[in-house]
Amino acid sequence: MTNSKQKLVLASGSPRRLELLHQIGIEPARLMPMDIDETPVKLEHPRTLCRRLSQQKAEAAQAALKSEQAWKDAYVLGSDTVVAVGRRIVGKAEYTEEASAALHLLSGRSHWVYTGICLVTPDGKIRQKVAETKVRFKRLSTREIDAYIASGQWRGKAGAYGIQGIAGAFVQKLTGSYTNVVGLPLYETMSLLSGEGFEVTSGWLEG
């Protein structure tokens, strides 16, 4: 558990991000998924996109909390993950056809996973980091792609795959942060929080 005097609000409903925070002993006091427009600006770089969206999520959550006195001292954490081949963004697929197209694109080549994290401190400071990971997929057969789509594990995930599931077997090589690909880079997140006075290690006590 975190320090009882400190509260962290996670501006996300992602179970993967919540699990990753639990991994380093952090229990968010509140989850606040923010419904924002995630459409890229024309010619926007994937790195810029994830940075912008993570900030928008964090700021939207903080704005929603302003009217609640009990949350005026909360830290707010926003995060957004973007998958790209070069500068081509591979978004969250809504339909099986989109998922199939994404997996065919990623098959046998390298892609980048960018995650932007944004922390809004109790005094309103905004701090940001972006993590980058290079991932290479093996060449996928049509049968593998069809079976993966049938599993449903692509739903709601950037790039139409989740590395922590079946798709972990597709990864030939990974350079950088694994937790970044899952959805929240833990090194960067811990660095951001501790750098702004949030007691990360208070949740590490046995029992």
Curated annotation (Swiss-Prot):
Q: Where is this site: Important for substrate specificity?
A: R16, T81, Q164
Q: For this protein, what is any one GO molecular function term?
A: dTTP diphosphatase activity
> Looking at the UniProt record for this protein, which Gene Ontology cellular component terms does it annotate, in alphabetical order?
cytoplasm
Q: Which UniProt keywords apply?
A: Cytoplasm, Hydrolase, Nucleotide metabolism
Q: What is its main location?
A: cytoplasm
Q: Which cofactor does it need?
A: a divalent metal cation
**Record: active site:** D80
Return the protein name: dTTP/UTP pyrophosphatase
Gene name of the record: maf1
